[in-house]
Amino acid sequence: MGIQNKDGALYFATGIDNSGLYSGRQEAMGIIKAMAGEITAFDVFGGIGISAGIAFAQAAKGAYEFEKQFQHSMKEVATLSSGIKGSLTDYMNQVVEITRAVPVSANEAAKALYQIVSAGHDGADGMKVLEVSAKAAVGGVTDTATAADAITTLLNAYKLDVSEAENLSDQLFTTVRLGKTSFGELGKSIAQVAPVAAAYGVEIDQVLAAVATLTKQGTPTAQAMTQIRASIIAVSKVLGDGAFDNRTYQEALAEVARQAEGSESKLRELVPEVEAVNAVLGLTGINVKEAAGHLEEMQDATGAAEAAFKEMASSAENQMKLLGNNITAALRPLGKEILKEISSAAQSMNEAFNDGS
């Protein structure tokens, strides 16, 4: 193992074919020069105050660190999916392509993909959910995994096809707009109510409209979910089997309130659970008109997620993230070759240690 000089750059002579690394270096230098040339009319490296060697070293280090971390995260996903394991390079490329249009990091996207695949959405379906979740994360100012958790929870609870992912994202964003909550809060608490609501036949738009109404009144998001869950169970006891078959959740609560005849004590007899009572009071009486209005808007939520994404993606911060993602994607050939070289060398050394033991 020695050191060789080639075109002013040093390489370890390990016996490993590093022609790919050399070509990757040449490609990276071309990319750096092209980008620098767009920025300054001076000498492409001198104009930004660094030498060509320093520029390459910085680019190489960044490309290597990115590829190492990204590969590790995607290999974690591959432990859950034989399909992804068998086409790992292709899926890595697909994830990177998403990040060239959506300002989230590839590593963040890979971590979210792990959650998505874990929730049962693999292959092309998983990638569809990932793209919707990444856009939702940008528009909702949260992380991709949190957005994915909310969307997959609803998909699974209501046994929906992934083609409904975008519609769910629209409804979640409409909840944020109408209520006093955030996408992150919804993502962390929607699982409290979704399975029960689905089991009793209460539709998603009705649940989310109720969340908007209750949180607008000042009820914390997690508590609103608890109230809705408790009221679904309680109302079904009062109205019997099929309580929600021919009426919305909001209409069912209004019927219970009607039976209470305006008496809070009678309401407590019908619905003993405190959280359930609070949901009835928060969605009927003086609040019934607003509750109905929120439900109507929820049923016309199409495009809400895309509008939020476009608004946030245009910010200077997110445009800089996108630029970073595009530069990283362009330098991946260099990062992959360095990682391959170092991994092969490390493997050879480990084998040598094992052989000598």
Regions found by a protein language model. Name each.
Residues 84-93, 107, 222, 263-271, ...:
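Short, surface-exposed acidic
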